Amino acid sequence: MSVRKLSALSLSIGGVPLIPSVSLVAAANGESRDCHGTICHPVNEFCYVATERCHPCIEVCNNQTHNYDAFLCAKECSAYKTFEPLKAEMLDIQNTQQLILLLLTILLVLIALRCAFQFLRWLIGNRCFQKLMRRLQSKAYPHPATANGKDLNATTIQNLNAINHPGSDLERAQSQIYSVAGAAEGSVVTMTTPVSTRYPAENSTTPTTVMTEIGYGYDNQAMVVTPVSEKPSAATIPVAF
């Protein structure tokens, strides 16, 4: 099969070829030529009759050198002339493929991140997931229970009567105020001693106190409290004219 009869296979998207014309190179590699015991490269070399050795095609096909020979290039290096223009195209295709691969990788990463974000939003809003998280938290951090077995950290208390019921320790005694003999004069008394009959709380053995008929008092008699029974009534007070 001749190299010239091979047609290049190509696939393009938007005018950019993705599969280079490699069928020509593959066919040429199968037609290696023997040059007096030496195998020449099927594309880049030819058997030069003058030297009986493999000679590079670039020397006779490059018009910028003094060894340029158009007839010899067309006869012996036809595969080289066909393949050489494709090198730049193949290089562009490789660069394009690398760029496409990079863009696809970035796109897949963005899609994966978006899917993960949507899944987390759905998972947080799911009631089953919230119940599962509450159970895990209750197992990891158990709340201390009260003496009667009720959990005060719970959202509800099942037995409200456990806090306030008849006969419980939480019941408070009612405050009581009793009237005594001095209440008529406007004195409010407590459970023990009327306000009007309270006396200084000094020790009677100190030198600053003097024993009196009431029991004890100050050295200054004007500071001694007069008992209620000895207070003069309104009838005995003389009226000044």
UniProtKB/Swiss-Prot annotation:
Signal peptide: 1-27
A cellular-component GO term for this protein: apical plasma membrane
Disulfide bonds: C35-C47, C40-C54, C57-C77, C61-C73
Effect on the protein upon substituting F46A: Abrogates binding to egr, probably due to disruption of the hydrophobic core. Abrogates egr-induced apoptosis in wing imaginal discs
Null allele phenotype: RNAi-mediated knockdown in gut progenitor cells, enterocytes or cells of the enteroblast-enterocyte lineage decreases stress-induced intestinal stem cell proliferation. RNAi-mediated knockdown in insulin producing cells of the brain mitigates body size reduction in animals fed a low-protein diet.
TM helices/strands, residue ranges: 99-119
Glycosylated residues in this chain: N63
All ranges on the Extracellular side of the membrane: 28-98
Up-regulation conditions: By bacterial infection in the gut.
Keyword field contains ATP-binding: no
Major location (coarse): membrane
Miscellaneous comment text of the record: The name 'grindelwald' comes from the village at the foot of the Eiger mountain in Switzerland after which the TNF gene egr is named.
Assembly and oligomerization: Interacts (via extracellular cysteine-rich domain) with egr (via secreted TNF-homology soluble form); forms heterohexamers when 3 copies associate with egr trimers. Interacts with Traf6/TRAF2 and veli (via PDZ domain).
Role this protein plays: Acts as a receptor for TNF-cytokine egr. Plays a role in activation of JNK signaling and is required for egr-induced apoptosis, including in wing imaginal discs during development. May also play an egr-independent role in cell proliferation. TNF receptor involved in triggering JNK-dependent proliferation of the enteroblast-enterocyte lineage in response to stress-induced release of egr by intestinal stem cells and enteroblasts. Involved in regulation of insulin production in response to dietary protein shortage keeping systemic growth in check.
Protein name: Tumor necrosis factor receptor superfamily member grnd
Organism: Drosophila melanogaster (Fruit fly)
